[in-house]
Amino acid sequence: MEDGNTTLLTEFVLTGLTDHQGLQVPLFLLFLMIYLITVVGNLGLIALIWSDPHLHIPMYLFLGSLAFVDAWISSAVTPNMLFDLLSKNKMISLSECMIQFFAFAFGGTTECFLLGTMAYDRYVAICKPLLYPVIMTNRLCIRLLVSVFIGGFLHSLFHVLFLLRLTFCNSNIIHHFYCDIIPLYNISCTDPTLNLLLVFILSGSIQVFTIMTVLVSYTLVLFTILKMKSLQGIRKAFSTCGAHLLSVSLYYGPLLFMYVLPASQQTDGQGMMDSLFYTVIIPVLNPIIYSLRNKQVTDSLKKRLERHV
């Protein structure tokens, strides 16, 4: 498409993780294995929660939703990355690029809200155990989950709509392994300052809000644990919160660097490594973390395995 003497680009080239021919097949096999483990692990966790009536409580409904979001994030990025590792044609259209970014951003924002909601759930479970069934009902849980997914959808849609104001005319090379928003801004012919400001304000606000929710919730949880005199109660509290706290710690580190640190301070290599950790590594770790550190999940899994052995 042309506008005067300027050709507007509608197709882009993803540089991918590496252009070293000797590394592409080993990386393909590695990430294919990780992706299969991610999908099987997260969908298996969802199936386990769905099939066990004892796990039909808010805590595990949130966990099942987290497993779905992790599988979604990985599926939004990894299949295309695997294809590009073996393909000589690394082209992607602008519309496909926006769809991929929307899918990824929807999952990322939803997980952000979800981790904050899960922290509040842990706070109620530990600090107000007698009132937990009254406060955290399944009805409230479903309302919270609907709000979380709507929030993720609207935030992602907002950024995609603002992407439409940008034009691309100089370079069609995206130095990344998927269509992320910052690399697109870097090759835009239109001044992306407004878009960058919105990313900083909106993404930063969401992260600050959810991080504060997590910090306040776990500060109150810690005070409650310190008042406990029963060793069994302390162990149960740590069992309830430990997996979620570890998951939160792994999640927010790379995310802060990806979207809050100014783009001028990030290198392409650093950005890709942060994205790789967030889109590939965390989704495969979460079901392992929650399965190994949660007694009810492990007990339910053992029962299912014993029935089929």
Swiss-Prot record:
Disulfide bonds join C97-C189. InterPro entries: GPCR_Rhodpsn, GPCR_Rhodpsn_7TM, Olfact_rcpt. It is a multi-pass membrane protein. Glycans are attached at N5, N186. Residues 1-28, 78-93, 166-198, 261-271 are extracellular. Pfam families: 7tm_4 (PF13853). This is Olfactory receptor 5H18. The chain crosses the membrane at residues 29-49, 57-77, 94-114, 145-165, 199-219, 240-260, 272-292. GO terms for molecular function: G protein-coupled receptor activity; olfactory receptor activity. PANTHER family: OLFACTORY RECEPTOR. One of its GO terms (biological process) is G protein-coupled receptor signaling pathway. The keyword Cell membrane applies. Belongs to the G-protein coupled receptor 1 family. It is found in: Cell membrane. Keywords: Cell membrane, Disulfide bond, G-protein coupled receptor, Glycoprotein, Membrane, Olfaction, Receptor, Sensory transduction, Transducer, Transmembrane, Transmembrane helix. Residues 50-56, 115-144, 220-239, 293-309 are cytoplasmic. One of its GO terms (cellular component) is plasma membrane. The gene is Or5h18. The keyword Cell division does not apply. Potential odorant receptor.
